[in-house]
């Protein structure tokens, strides 16, 4: 396990689930609203909206919240969000990609830059680190979905490219453009997924010691807590020994 998956796991162990969940619903709602504004409010005719709704449902977001986010796109509340990607280097030289939906580019850029600077990292130009990542689809299932063989068979039939199974569940990867079809086929075989989204997958990882890892985790936590930030991706990894210390 590496990068953001480890970060999520550590935050889960530290008991931040409720706070993270509340903020997650807010960010999912923003993605739904933006998707609905950019296309038709009908998920059957809007692939991005369909994916956003699928992911929201997978995260147990209430139906009323989803419908409210869609209706908000049709309103004249003056909220228009720009999609912005930031790239930079964190402590230990790790690569970091930040995706944001913002109604104030200056505010978001200032906050993101400050987070990098305070952590000892630096914000770079767009494209400065993304070439070291691949854009792919990620579908996650809980362990209860089935054993490794069952999930592997379903993933192959669905057209997925890779499957990683472990005690925490199953992570299925597919081509970026195939995520809609693959997730639909997997749902028919395995039921509803725990999450469905597109991610930046690092081509190689940078292993960190405990000190540098703590600094990176602090940076990721600050970025995740920013209301404008939707997703954060990085290529760090730590040993099992360091992981246990960070989770304590």
Swiss-Prot record:
<dbReference type="InterPro" id="IPR048300">
    <property type="entry name" value="TACO1_YebC-like_2nd/3rd_dom"/>
</dbReference>
<dbReference type="Pfam" id="PF01709">
    <property type="entry name" value="Transcrip_reg"/>
</dbReference>
<dbReference type="Pfam" id="PF20772">
    <property type="entry name" value="TACO1_YebC_N"/>
</dbReference>
<dbReference type="InterPro" id="IPR026564">
    <property type="entry name" value="Transcrip_reg_TACO1-like_dom3"/>
</dbReference>
<keyword id="KW-0804">Transcription</keyword>
<dbReference type="GO" id="GO:0005829">
    <property type="term" value="C:cytosol"/>
</dbReference>
<dbReference type="InterPro" id="IPR049083">
    <property type="entry name" value="TACO1_YebC_N"/>
</dbReference>
<dbReference type="GO" id="GO:0006355">
    <property type="term" value="P:regulation of DNA-templated transcription"/>
</dbReference>
<dbReference type="InterPro" id="IPR029072">
    <property type="entry name" value="YebC-like"/>
</dbReference>
<protein>
    <recommendedName>
        <fullName>Probable transcriptional regulatory protein BCAN_A1755</fullName>
    </recommendedName>
</protein>
<keyword id="KW-0238">DNA-binding</keyword>
<comment type="similarity">
    <text>Belongs to the TACO1 family.</text>
</comment>
<dbReference type="GO" id="GO:0003677">
    <property type="term" value="F:DNA binding"/>
</dbReference>
<dbReference type="InterPro" id="IPR002876">
    <property type="entry name" value="Transcrip_reg_TACO1-like"/>
</dbReference>
<keyword id="KW-0805">Transcription regulation</keyword>
<dbReference type="InterPro" id="IPR017856">
    <property type="entry name" value="Integrase-like_N"/>
</dbReference>
<keyword id="KW-0963">Cytoplasm</keyword>
